[in-house]
UniProtKB/Swiss-Prot annotation:
Gene name of the record: CSN8
A Gene Ontology biological process term: red, far-red light phototransduction
Name of the protein this chain belongs to: COP9 signalosome complex subunit 8
Family: Belongs to the CSN8 family.
Keyword NAD among record annotations: no
Organism: Brassica oleracea
Length: 23
C-alpha cells in the first residue's frame, strides 16, 4: 500500500514539475 501511495504521489509531483517547466 505504501509503495502504491508513494508511486501516486511521485507521479503527481512529476506532473506538477512538468507543468511548471512548460510554463
Amino acid at each position: 500500500l505504501w509503495t502504491r501511495d508513494y508511486a501516486g504521489v511521485y507521479e503527481a509531483i512529476r506532473g506538477f514539475d512538468w507543468s511548471q517547466d512548460a510554463k
